[in-house]
C-alpha cells in the first residue's frame, strides 16, 4: 500500500492483531524486507496473483485508525526486527574505535520520490551540530546524498561506511547493526527513521 518505511512503522499493529485473535495472517509486502519478519509466523506474499484464500482483509494504513477508535491510545514501541548477532558484533567492534557519543545522521531521501524536496535537508544545514564537542557523527546514507560529503565543511568529523553497508541481499542488515551500536539518530522522514524507532533507538 505504501513505502518500506510505512510498512516498518505500522507493522506493529499486525502483531497486535495476531496476539489478540490468534489469527493466521497473510501480509503482502516488499520482498526486500521479508527478512525483517523472519521471527514471525506470518505468511508473506509479494505478488497479488499469489494471494491465498482469506476471510478478511484490511489495508495496513487503516489499522492505526481502527486501533485508536477502540482504545483511544496508540501502542507503545514493538520491536519485531530480528538481530544478526554476527553483524551486530562486527559493527560493535568497528564503532568501538570511535570514542565518545555517537550520532547517526540521515539527510537525503530517494530523489525519485515526488516530494523529496520537502523532506530532504542539505548536509550543510547541520554545520552547527558538528561544532558541538565530543560528538561523533556516523553517516547513515546509502546512495543518494553521499555526493554532498565531498564539499561538506566538517567532513573530517563525519564517518562514512557506505561502501561497507548493506551490500548483500537483505536490505538494512548492516544498518541495523550500526543502529544498535550508536546512541542517537537524527533523520529526515525516510524508511531509516522508522527502522531506528522500531529498534528502540532514540530518534529525532
Kindly give the residue locations of the regions a language model identified.
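Catalytic machinery of carbohydrate-active enzymes
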Residues: 1-204
